[in-house]
C-alpha cells in the first residue's frame, strides 16, 4: 500500500538537528525541465498566478532564479514542509526505522517535483499544483505532469499482488494522478467533526488528521487496507455508515477551539 500526501505552501529550511539520509527525487529529470520555465517568470507574473502580494512574489522569483535541479537539495521534504498536515505527521519524532519504511510507502505530491519520498532533499519553492502555468506540454501543471506521476506510482507497486493507494492528499493534488493510467485500487480517507448532530469537514482539522493517519500507518507498518478502519488518533473513529469500499469516513466530536478565530 502506498500513502499519498499533499505538500504545504509554507516551508522551513532550518537545520533538522539530526543526521538523516538525503535522497534524490525520482522525477528530478522532469523537475529540471519545469525549472527552465519557472526561472523565466517575472515577479508580476508570479503575483498574478499565485494571487500573492508583492513581497511574496519577489521572494518566489528569487527562489525560482536560484533553483538548480542539478545541485543537491537543501532539506528533506518531510521536514521542510510546514503546515497542518506536517504537524500531524511530526516527521521529526519518527525513528530512523520509521523513516526508512516511509521511504518505500509514502509519497508527497508536488507541483515542482511530481512525487517526493520523505527524505528527498529539495530546494525552496512554491508552486501549487492547481495554478495555471504555460509549458510546452500545455497550460497547467496537470498538463505538464500528464500521466508521469501515475506511472511512477505504478512502478513503486509493480510487484504488489493488489496495488492500493491510500489517498490522503487534497483534491487539487490528487487530480495530478492520472486515474486512467493508475493501476490498482484507491482508498480515500475523509475526516469530519460532529457538532449538534451535524458533520462538517473543517479543513484545518482535516489536514492535520491526514498527517496523523500517515504517521499512524508508518508507525504500525500498515500494508493491509482492511486495517485502516482501526485508525483512532486524535479522537477519530471509523464510521461504517457514510463509508464505502473506496471512501473511508472518520469522525469525532468537534473540539471546542474550532469555533474560535485563530490569531
From Swiss-Prot:
GO terms for cellular component: cytosol. Signal peptide: none annotated. It comes from the Bacteria. Pfam families: H2O2_YaaD. GO terms for biological process: response to hydroperoxide. NCBIfam families: PRK02101.1-3. Belongs to the UPF0246 family. This is UPF0246 protein Mmar10_0828. It comes from Maricaulis maris (strain MCS10). The lineage of its organism: Bacteria, Pseudomonadati, Pseudomonadota, Alphaproteobacteria, Maricaulales.
Amino acid at each position: 500500500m502506498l500513502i499519498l500526501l499533499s505538500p504545504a505552501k509554507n516551508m522551513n529550511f532550518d537545520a533538522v538537528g539530526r543526521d538523516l539520509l538525503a535522497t534524490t527525487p525520482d522525477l528530478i529529470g522532469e523537475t529540471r525541465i519545469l525549472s527552465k520555465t519557472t526561472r523565466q517568470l517575472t515577479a508580476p507574473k508570479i503575483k498574478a498566478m499565485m494571487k500573492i502580494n508583492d513581497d511574496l512574489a519577489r521572494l518566489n522569483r528569487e527562489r525560482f532564479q536560484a533553483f538548480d535541479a542539478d545541485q543537491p537539495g537543501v532539506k528533506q521534504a518531510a521536514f521542510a514542509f510546514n503546515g497542518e498536515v506536517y504537524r500531524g505527521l511530526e516527521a521529526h519524532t519518527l525513528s530512523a526505522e520509521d523513516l526508512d519504511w516511509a521511504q518505500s510507502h509514502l509519497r508527497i505530491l508536488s507541483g515542482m517535483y511530481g512525487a517526493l519520498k520523505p527524505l528527498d532533499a529539495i530546494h525552496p519553492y512554491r508552486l501549487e499544483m492547481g495554478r495555471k502555468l504555460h509549458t510546452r506540454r500545455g497550460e497547467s501543471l496537470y498538463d505538464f505532469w500528464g500521466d508521469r506521476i501515475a506511472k511512477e506510482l505504478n512502478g513503486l507497486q509493480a510487484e504488489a499482488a493488489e496495488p492500493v493507494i491510500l489517498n490522503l492528499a487534497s483534491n487539487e493534488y490528487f487530480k495530478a494522478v492520472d486515474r486512467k493510467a493508475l493501476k490498482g485500487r484507491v482508498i480515500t480517507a475523509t475526516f469530519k467533526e460532529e457538532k449538534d448532530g451535524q458533520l462538517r469537514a473543517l479543513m484545518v482539522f482535516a489536514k492535520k488528521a491526514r498527517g496523523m493517519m500517515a504517521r499512524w500507518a508508518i508507525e504500525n507498518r500498515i500494508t493491509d487496507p482492511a486495517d485502516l478502519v482501526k485508525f483512532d488518533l486524535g479522537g477519530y473513529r471509523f464510521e461504517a455508515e457514510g463509508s464505502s469500499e473506496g471512501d473511508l469516513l472518520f469522525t469525532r466530536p468537534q473540539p471546542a477551539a474550532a469555533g474560535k478565530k485563530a490569531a
